[in-house]
Amino acid sequence: MNIIRGKIPSAQKVVIYGPEGIGKTSFAACFPDPLFIDTEGGTKHIDVARLPAPTSWTMLLEQVQEVKKENTSVCKTLVLDTADWAEQLCIKHICDKYKKSGIEDFGYGKGYIYLKEEFGRLLNLLELSLIHI
């Protein structure tokens, strides 16, 4: 019988949900060695390390890949602030790719399937890391 004792190293994945101004960003700033990908500009008045605000979905994915490549040498916690603004970048990317003016223009729910698949790429990138998210 193979018994394993002790902690198994793994990163914590946390989602913080709440209305604007409740302190989600301030709370995340207290996490171990945080690095923010600030999609909405919520860290302007907080002394934190941040990457340039992504202007496209591709830029956001590239930032995550770079942090992942550096692993824990660049930060211990990667904070995506916020997921709903990241989703808007994703929607714009999908609409541009398929030459649609909006996510509803694909027909019965198809745009949301593309959104789920594309956003899943980001979640997979985040999952394969030893950095807290």
What are these regions (language model features)?
Residues 54-61, 109-124:
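Amphipathic alpha-helical transducer elements in NTP-driven molecular machines
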Residues 131-133:
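Conserved small/polar residues in nucleotide/adenosyl-binding loops
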Residues 2-80, 84-89:
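Conserved P-loop
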Residues 88-115:
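A solvent-exposed, charged loop/short amphipathic helix patch at secondary-structure junctions
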